[in-house]
Amino acid sequence: MTLYDVPAPAKLNLFLHVVGRRADGYHLLQTAFRFIDLADTLHFEARADGAIGRAYELPGVAESDDLVVRAARSLQRATGTRQGAQIGLHKRIPQGGGLGGGSSDAATTLIALNRLWGTGLSRSQLMQLALPLGADVPVFVFGQSAFAQGVGEDLTAVALPPAAYLVVQPDAGVPTAAIFSDPDLTRDCASVTIADFLALLTSCFGRNDLEPVVLRRYPEVSGAVRWLFEHGLRVRMSGSGACLFAEFPTLPEAVLAQEEITATMRVAGKTTSHTHPGFRLVQASTGLTEHPLRNWIAS
């Protein structure tokens, strides 16, 4: 087969603790990753000329900075293959929202081209290629819900119960580097264990240490959190934001909450005495047990 159309799922950080900082400036984290069925779609078609062609545009992202292109070229260098690919991308995951869209696209590129080109790298080999592309890329190659430590490379699979999520996107762009460099960021959270996390397994476990910084710096995000709480929805930020999520036991409950919030927003928009901050409901999504392409890699 010479072409694939494959998904690149979003991730949520169910909690995110900053427990320290290395001498090189990288932060030491503890977090739990879960994939959801909100996903980008990538199209790969083999080329015999060795070129990597990008059949899409990402606003503000040059081809040399595109993680998809970088992932493809990294795999070429590592394997010595002379094959190339024409790559298409349909974005559904909000860019820069803390949902790992770019990282997921890069991981799907490594997985799909490893199969398309027949380069035969193992999961651990692909994960070694993934880490230089970004701290979140390895977990998508790992392919399971995971408890992560270090800078994101120390991953342990965890079994999570079924759950659904409503994802909210505030009208704010949050630069990750600025949040991690903020002097008010707490960097000494007490470490937790996997057992601590698995004993509770609720959306109330721990916290996101980046969230207070984002709420202080971005009124669009703090306003969305406040408005949603006032209307019965308790949310948490994923990653460095700005996207927020609420957890539900089942997808129908998440869909119902989405419909109720949408109706309330519609009424508020028509009534001058009621306002709500700018945000959109991205999608009611199901939590996944594993990455859709997990079985494409030899362990």
From Swiss-Prot:
Pfam families: GHMP_kinases_C, GHMP_kinases_N
Domain of life the protein comes from: Bacteria
Binding, ATP: P94, Q95, G96, G97, G98, L99, G100, G101, G102, S103, S104
Catalytic reaction list: 4-CDP-2-C-methyl-D-erythritol + ATP = 4-CDP-2-C-methyl-D-erythritol 2-phosphate + ADP + H(+)
Associated pathway: Isoprenoid biosynthesis; isopentenyl diphosphate biosynthesis via DXP pathway; isopentenyl diphosphate from 1-deoxy-D-xylulose 5-phosphate: step 3/6
Primary enzyme class: transferase
UniProt cross-references to NCBIfam families, sorted A to Z: ispE
Gene3D superfamilies: 3.30.230.10, GHMP kinase, C-terminal domain
Active site (UniProt): K11, D136
PANTHER family referenced in this protein's UniProt entry, alphabetically: 4-DIPHOSPHOCYTIDYL-2-C-METHYL-D-ERYTHRITOL KINASE, CHLOROPLASTIC
Known function: Catalyzes the phosphorylation of the position 2 hydroxy group of 4-diphosphocytidyl-2C-methyl-D-erythritol.
Family to which the UniProt record says this protein belongs: Belongs to the GHMP kinase family. IspE subfamily.
Molecular function GO labels: 4-(cytidine 5'-diphospho)-2-C-methyl-D-erythritol kinase activity; ATP binding
Protein's name according to its UniProt entry: 4-diphosphocytidyl-2-C-methyl-D-erythritol kinase
GO biological process, one term: isopentenyl diphosphate biosynthetic process, methylerythritol 4-phosphate pathway
Gene name as annotated: ispE
Organism field: Bordetella parapertussis (strain 12822 / ATCC BAA-587 / NCTC 13253)
Keywords, comma-separated and alphabetical: ATP-binding, Isoprene biosynthesis, Kinase, Nucleotide-binding, Transferase
Assigned EC number: 2.7.1.148
